[in-house]
């Protein structure tokens, strides 16, 4: 059995009971080393296999092979495993290799949901997720999606917004959005949601400071109706009040 588990954004309080129970039931836990530290309370003396960044295929293949050997394996992924996580890669590998492995997918709280709850209620109407990482998706494709989302007036949740190797991507995204969104459009940023160094702040499309944003950040750009009241970012659902 291979359980692909979304462990949420980092706080044990934001993990589902199903995820906790699956971790406790597993014989072996496989994951990115940073994420294995986040679930230490549930792994005890279990065997924990840690890998570094950019070794996702190796990590998933190891988990699959251990499950094939008869072990109860937990492969952990931050947030929800089916949103920029390991779930799809596991299913692709199992399908491509025509393997007979029981795979169970356990949902978790994705970063946008955790961030939204800290900022107010910015996702009350239609929204989309866009990752600014171009490691697996060509940047021109990402740019087209940003433009389309802006023109459609979606609230936009930017994942993987800025790293040492991609310092200009978020600024470029904001430049593209300036063609369809007002400079006064509210923007919310949350860093390390649910973790010890959690931070949050509100700004606007025109006043955004990109420097503090990193890979632990989630950036939410509002739509034409989004506003800030009493320090809370709100996107109206459309009720007549």
Curated annotation (Swiss-Prot):
Pfam families: TP_methylase. Coiled coil: none annotated. The keyword Signal does not apply. It catalyses: Co(II)-factor III + S-adenosyl-L-methionine + H(+) = Co(II)-factor IV + S-adenosyl-L-homocysteine. It comes from the Bacteria. It is an enzyme of class 2 (transferase). One of its GO terms (molecular function) is methyltransferase activity. One of its GO terms (biological process) is methylation. Pathway: Cofactor biosynthesis; adenosylcobalamin biosynthesis; cob(II)yrinate a,c-diamide from sirohydrochlorin (anaerobic route): step 3/10. Its EC number is 2.1.1.-. InterPro entries: 4pyrrol_Mease, 4pyrrol_Methylase_sf, 4pyrrole_Mease_sub1, 4pyrrole_Mease_sub2, Cbl_synth_CobJ/CibH_dom, Precorrin_MeTrfase. Keywords: Cobalamin biosynthesis, Methyltransferase, S-adenosyl-L-methionine, Transferase. NCBIfam families: cobJ_cbiH, PRK15478.1. Belongs to the precorrin methyltransferase family. May also convert cobalt-precorrin-3 to cobalt-precorrin-4. This is Probable cobalt-factor III C(17)-methyltransferase. It comes from Salmonella typhimurium (strain LT2 / SGSC1412 / ATCC 700720). The gene is cbiH.
């Amino acid at each position: 059995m291979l359980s692909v588990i979304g462990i949420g954004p980092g706080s044990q309080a934001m993990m589902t009971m199903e995820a906790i129970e699956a971790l406790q039931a597993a014989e072996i836990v496989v994951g990115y080393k940073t994420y294995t530290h986040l679930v230490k309370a549930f792994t005890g003396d279990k065997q924990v296999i840690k890998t570094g960044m950019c070794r996702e295929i190796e990590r998933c293949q190891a988990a699959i092979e251990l499950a094939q050997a008869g072990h109860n394996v937990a492969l952990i992924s931050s947030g929800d495993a089916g949103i920029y996580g390991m779930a799809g890669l596991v299913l692709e590998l199992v399908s491509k290799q025509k393997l007979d492995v029981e795979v169970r997918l356990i949902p978790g709280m994705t970063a946008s949901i955790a961030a939204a709850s800290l900022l107010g209620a910015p996702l009350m109407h239609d929204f989309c997720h866009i990752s600014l990482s171009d490691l697996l998706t060509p940047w021109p494709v990402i740019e087209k999606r940003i433009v389309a989302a802006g023109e459609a007036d979606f609230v936009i949740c930017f994942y993987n917004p800025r790293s040492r190797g991609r310092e200009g991507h978020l600024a470029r995204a904001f430049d593209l959005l300036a063609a369809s969104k007002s400079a006064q459009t509210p923007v919310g940023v949350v860093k390390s949601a649910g973790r010890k160094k959690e931070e949050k702040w509100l700004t606007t499309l025109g006043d955004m400071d990109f420097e503090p944003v990193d890979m632990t950040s989630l950036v939410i750009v509002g739509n034409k109706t989004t506003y800030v009241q009493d320090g809370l970012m709100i996107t109206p659902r459309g009720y007549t009040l």
